[in-house]
Amino acid sequence: MMKKSAFLAVIILMFCNACSIKGSFQGLYSYYYKTKSQDPLLLIVPDTSTSLCEINKPDTPRIIVINGSILKECIKTNNKAVVYLWAPKCKGKFCYSLNLLQQECDTRGVALYIVAEYYDTQLMQINYKINKPISGIDVEYYNSNRTSKYLSRFIYDLTLRKDMSGRLIYFEDGVFKKSFESIEEI
């Protein structure tokens, strides 16, 4: 019995030693600090005297670091607006090309605000054909580096709702109306 237990322990140790996790934990953590160190000029934290609405999309990609309350104030300046919670590495059915999403919103007369769920230096350095700069959630403001924690706080600040289904959040005259998955619902 003792030999069998020792043999089993050796097999388990060998199996665990041979296993490794490939890839990153993007989506679980923000990667804000990694992005900040890789490309310090990519992230812009606006001073409190500058309104998010006044920041134009620069010629080179820049990510505006914001919280939900700041974005909510800017959304109030539009008749219709959609916030897209962008997961840069998302490959699912309801993950959209930023360029396509901008075209759809332009066709429907809806302002588009893109907010990255987490930071990805490589995909954030692309110069997308969008009207407004991409925003990133301020993890220091929300005092968390875990995506689920700061994202739920951001959404609450934006909509005053605790739970949300869908990556697209729709507003009329600054008031939250609904959230949805499909761009056809815009």
Give the residues covered by each predicted segment.
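A short acidic/small-residue loop/turn micro-motif
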Residues: 182-186
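Short active-site neighborhood of thiol/selenol oxidoreductases, capturing the structured segment around
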Residues: 72-100
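C-terminal motif of bacterial Sec signal peptides marking the signal peptidase cleavage site
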Residues: 15-18
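Structural microenvironment flanking redox-active thiols in thiol-disulfide oxidoreductases
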Residues: 83, 94-133
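N-terminal "domain-start" segment that seeds a small globular fold
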Residues: 23-74
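Short, internal strand/loop/helix patches
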Residues: 127-165
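Positively charged n-region of N-terminal signal peptides that target proteins for export
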Residues: 1-5
